[in-house]
C-alpha cells in the first residue's frame, strides 16, 4: 500500500487485530492499523456514557469495529493475530490475561509504533523529570538545526501526539534524515514491550509511585528498566547515578544482559576517564560519550536559566545534554538551547512577581520526591499553597 506516494510494507493486510482501550493512544493505533489494511476491533470495558460523547465519536470515526462495554470474547475475536493495549489498561485486566492464556501476543502502543517507524527515537522515562527532560531534549535538537517531534506520554497542554502518530508520520511522509522522535514514556507503556529499542533511552530517577497499579516498588522498578532491555550496542542508555534505584539498574547492567552503551549522569560525582558520563566539573556541565574519550564542556551551571531551578534541573540538563550530543548536536547549540529554554507549564513555572513576592505554579508536583526537589530549589522564604487528595 502507499501513503503520500511512499510504499509501506505493513504485513498487517487482512490480519485480525484487537486494540484494547478506546483512549487517545488506542484510537490512534486502531486508526493506523486500519490504514495498513488490518481488520481491527477497538474495544473498551467502559460504557459509551462513561467514555463520553467526544471519545465515542472519535472511536466511531475509525474504520474499525468499535465495541464499548465489551466482553472478553468480543474484545478477542477468533483468529486474533495480536493485541495492542492502551497504557490505561492494567496488566491484570481480564482481557489481557485471557489473551496471554490463548497465546496471543500483547503489545503496548509504543511497541506497535516501534515496529513501523523510520525515525530514531529518544525516549525518557522515570518517576519525575520526564516531561521537562523530553521537551528540553527536543529544544536542544532544534537549536542544533535538527528536526524533533515530541510525542508519547507528555503531559504538556499543547502536545497531544501519541508515539503511534509520530511513528506513522515518519513512515508516511518522506522522512528527513535528521528527523528524530523525542518521546516521554510511562511505566504503563513499558508493561508490554518486547523489541522496543530507542536509539537513546533515559532514566531520570525512580521513587515510589503508581503503587496502586504496580504490585510492589520492585515491580515498578523492573517495569521502568524495560526501556533498556532490547537496546543494542549502537544505542545509548543514560541513567541517573544519584538515584538509588536507577543506580542499582546501572550497577547490574552486565548481569541483566543489557547491550546498550551505558552512560551514567551525576551532579555529585566526577568520573574516571574510563566511564562514559555526564557530570559537573569545576561548575561546568560536562559530557563524555566514550570511555577514554573527550570531555565536552557545555555551559556553567551558573548560567542555567530561571526556568531550570534547583538540583533536579541540573540532573535534567545533564541527561538532556548527553542525549542531544549523542544525536549530533554541537556543544554550542546545546548551550544556546539551554539558555533559551522557557520551561514547561505547571512545573516550577514562574507566573509573576508582585510587591517582592514571586508566584510559582508547580501544580504538576504530585508525589513526595517531586515536592522535596521543588522546595529544595527555593532560595527565598517560601509559602506553599497545597491541596487535593
Regions found by a protein language model. Name each.
Residues 1-108, 112:
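N-terminal leader/targeting and accessory segments in enzymes
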Residues 20, 43-45, 85-86, 151, ...:
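Thr-Gly-centered strand-to-loop micro-motif
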Residues 4-16, 28-36, 300-389:
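Nucleotide phosphate-binding/pyrophosphate-handling subdomain across enzymes
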Residues 23-24, 90, 128-132, 314, ...:
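Residue-level detector of alpha-helix initiation sites
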Residues 41-44, 67-70, 107-111, 152, ...:
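Beta-strand->loop->alpha-helix junctions that form or flank phosphate-binding loops
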Residues 23, 46-48, 154, 242-243, ...:
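Residues in the short beta-alpha loop(s) of Rossmann-like NAD(P)-binding domains
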Residues 34-35, 73-80, 87-241, 245-259, ...:
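Phosphate-binding loop of NTP-binding sites
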Residues 137, 279-300, 344-352:
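Acidic-glycine-rich active-site phosphate/pyrophosphate-binding loop
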Amino acid at each position: 500500500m502507499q501513503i503520500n506516494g511512499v510504499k509501506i510494507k505493513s504485513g498487517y493486510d487482512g490480519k485480525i487485530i484487537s486494540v484494547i482501550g478506546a483512549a487517545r493512544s488506542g484510537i490512534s493505533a486502531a486508526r493506523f492499523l486500519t490504514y495498513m489494511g488490518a481488520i481491527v476491533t477497538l474495544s473498551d470495558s467502559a460504557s459509551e456514557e462513561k467514555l463520553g460523547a467526544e471519545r465515542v465519536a472519535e472511536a466511531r470515526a475509525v474504520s474499525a469495529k468499535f465495541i464499548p462495554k465489551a466482553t472478553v470474547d468480543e474484545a478477542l475475536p477468533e483468529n486474533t493475530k495480536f493485541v495492542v493495549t492502551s497504557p490505561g489498561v492494567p496488566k491484570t485486566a481480564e482481557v489481557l490475561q485471557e489473551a496471554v492464556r490463548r497465546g496471543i501476543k500483547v503489545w503496548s502502543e509504543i511497541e506497535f509504533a516501534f515496529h513501523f517507524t523510520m525515525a530514531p527515537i529518544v525516549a525518557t522515562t522515570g518517576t519525575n523529570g520526564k516531561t521537562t527532560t523530553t521537551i528540553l531534549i527536543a529544544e536542544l535538537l532544534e537549536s542544533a538545526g535538527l528536526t524533533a517531534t515530541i510525542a508519547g506520554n507528555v503531559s504538556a497542554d499543547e502536545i497531544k501526539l501519541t508515539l503511534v502518530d509520530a511513528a506513522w508520520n515518519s513512515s508516511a511522509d518522506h522522512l528527513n534524515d535528521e528527523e528524530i522522535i523525542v518521546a516521554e514514556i510511562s511505566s504503563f507503556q513499558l508493561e508490554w514491550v518486547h523489541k522496543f529499542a530507542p536509539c537513546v533511552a533515559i532514566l531520570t530517577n525512580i521513587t515510589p509511585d503508581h503503587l496502586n497499579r504496580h504490585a510492589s516498588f520492585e515491580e515498578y522498578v523492573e517495569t521502568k528498566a524495560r526501556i533498556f532491555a532490547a537496546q543494542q550496542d549502537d544505542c545509548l542508555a543514560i541513567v541517573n547515578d544519584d538515584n538509588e534505584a536507577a543506580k542499582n539498574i546501572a550497577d547490574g547492567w552486565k548481569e541483566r544482559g543489557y547491550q546498550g552503551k551505558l552512560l551514567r549522569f551525576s551532579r555529585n560525582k566526577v568520573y574516571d576517564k574510563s566511564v562514559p558520563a555526564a557530570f559537573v566539573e569545576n561548575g561546568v556541565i560536562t559530557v563524555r560519550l566514550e570511555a577514554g574519550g573527550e570531555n565536552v564542556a557545555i555551559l556553567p551551571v551558573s548560567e542555567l536559566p530561571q526556568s531550570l531551578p534547583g538540583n533536579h534541573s541540573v540532573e535534567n540538563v545533564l541527561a538532556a545534554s548527553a542525549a542531544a550530543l549523542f544525536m549530533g548536536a554541537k556543544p554550542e547549540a546545546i548551550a544556546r538551547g539551554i539558555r533559551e529554554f522557557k520551561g514547561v507549564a505547571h512545573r516550577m513555572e514562574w507566573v509573576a512577581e508582585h510587591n517582592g513576592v514571586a508566584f510559582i505554579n508547580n501544580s504538576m508536583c504530585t508525589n513526595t520526591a517531586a515536592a522535596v526537589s521543588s522546595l529544595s530549589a527555593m532560595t527565598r522564604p517560601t509559602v506553599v499553597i497545597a491541596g487535593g487528595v
